[in-house]
Regions:
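Detector for outer-membrane/organellar transmembrane beta-barrel domains
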Residues: 223-353, 409
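Outer membrane beta-barrel
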Residues: 27-56, 62-192, 210-228, 264-268, ...
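Outer-membrane beta-barrel "beta-signal"
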Residues: 390-409
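Sequence/structural signature of outer-membrane beta-barrel proteins
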Residues: 47, 93-95, 110-114, 140-144, ...
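Transmembrane beta-barrel architecture of outer membranes
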Residues: 123-125, 165-167, 213-217, 254-262, ...
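Cleavable N-terminal export/targeting peptides
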Residues: 1-28, 407-409
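C-terminal closing repeat unit and adjoining cap/tail of repeat-based domains
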Residues: 359-376
Length: 409
């Protein structure tokens, strides 16, 4: 593990406790609450076909090959500890008794981005909240974490909105059962140059994302003994420009937007029926898997003559349907299906991602609160714009040991 990365983590943790110490003298009578928690998990995985080797430890339909042999011959085994997690959360008192600062810092070992395929520190949460204001990295308001089913695959259903990112959040309305929040979140556009790479390779190579404005998100949530309902919304500027050209032309932007409705219903005492539907344009970067935010679109005359090429915010639909069944205190099963459907533009490559499907069933054994083991079977399929598809069946067996300690001062 790189020394600089370890140093950053230790500095962040020490900063939290430094604040604690600094405040201690002024507000010695106040209560401090900390929880240290986490788990060690090992996942044994076998694929009957092949996925992108950088993603052997997470089941993502977008990483399934649609051309036989792309990632080698069929069959692959992996054993991973990347899901293992460590976190610290708690509350710090504030002078003049104006309410606590609640904080959370959490990491796992699942490398993504430039670290994809590696077992390395990955920041999940790093935020603090005082009153109505939250600052830091956590789940997007566009996301509904309560629709995440009881699965052991790290990545989970493809059709979910699932994104953690830096943000500034305001919650003007909050009760014991409901809240309404708005936020500005870090922009991150995913642009597909498509067939522009073929008829103008230089332009295709020089196109880049342009992120001049933050993303604007909002969320309304309510719950009861029956379950919960959440509606999330997003409005964003999805822009592009060119590197090394006069005035960075061509350049431009489109408006991205989306609505995400999620809910679960409590049935048979402990069971849950889970559902989520999301639709929008230019929202793929917020999805759990697959798609692109912006792609080129050509306009033709009825005679087939090209009039112009312009950018288009790509439409996308995501669906999740799962059932969490608790047979008794020790045994449980989660079964369900999810999809992501993209409405490709006419200038995306034939091999561009069009649809991802994901289905799974498991049987989990929890003999004690901090021990879990079980197996899961997953099926996934990727379909490209040219309707060529590839599929994979995965078997996973996992063992997880959890730990935690509460400290009150």
């Amino acid at each position: 593990m790189p020394y600089s990365r370890v140093g950053k983590i230790l500095c962040a943790l020490s900063s939290i406790f430094a604040v604690d110490a600094a405040l201690g003298g002024a507000i010695a009578q106040a209560k401090y609450s900390f929880e240290i928690y986490g788990f060690a998990e090992a996942d044994a995985i076998y694929d009957t076909n092949r996925v992108n080797p950088a993603w052997d430890d997470a089941f993502r339909p977008s990483k399934i090959a649609t051309v036989e042999g792309t990632f080698g011959s069929n069959g692959q085994t992996s054993i991973s500890v990347k899901q293992s997690r460590f976190g610290v959360q708690g509350s710090l008192p504030v002078e003049n008794n104006v309410g606590p600062i609640n904080f959370k810092f959490e990491i796992d070992m699942f490398g993504v981005g430039v670290d994809a395929g590696q077992t390395t520190i990955r920041l999940r949460h790093a935020y603090a909240e005082w009153g109505q204001v939250l600052a830091g990295q956590t789940h997007s308001l566009f996301m509904d974490i309560e629709t995440y089913p009881n699965v052991i695959d790290y990545w989970g259903p493809t059709g979910m909105v699932f994104y953690r990112l830096p943000q500034l959040r305001w919650t003007p309305y909050r009760t014991d059962t409901s809240h309404f929040s708005v936020a500005i979140e870090r922009p991150g556009n995913d642009i597909d140059a498509g067939q522009i790479r073929e008829f103008d390779p230089a332009l295709g190579a020089n196109l880049r994302n342009d992120e001049k404005l933050p993303d604007f998100t909002a969320q309304f949530y309510t719950k009861g003994t029956w379950g919960h309902v959440q509606l999330g919304g997003i409005l964003r500027r999805v822009g592009f420009d060119s590197v090394g050209t006069l005035n960075n032309e061509p350049k431009g932007h489109e408006t991205g937007w989306g609505l995400n409705l999620g809910a679960h219903a409590n049935v048979f005492q402990r069971d849950r029926i889970i559902g989520q539907v999301v639709y929008g344009e230019g929202i793929a970067s917020y999805m759990n898997d697959g798609g692109t935010d912006l792609a080129p679109q050509a306009t033709f005359t009825p005679q087939g003559i090209l009039l112009d090429v312009h950018a288009k915010a790509v439409p996308l639909l995501g669906v999740v349907a799962y059932y969490d069944r608790y047979w008794n205190d020790a045994w449980s099963t989660s079964i369900g299906y999810s999809l992501t459907q993209v409405d490709n533009t006419n200038l995306q490559d034939p091999s561009a991602y069009r649809k991802g499907e994901y289905a799974s069933i498991n049987l989990l054994y929890t003999p004690a609160k901090n021990i879990m083991m079980g197996g899961e079977v997953m099926w996934g399929q990727r379909t490209d714009r040219d309707h060529i598809s590839g599929s994979d069946v995965r078997f996973q067996f996992s063992v997880k040991y959890s730990f935690g300690a509460q400290i009150n001062l």
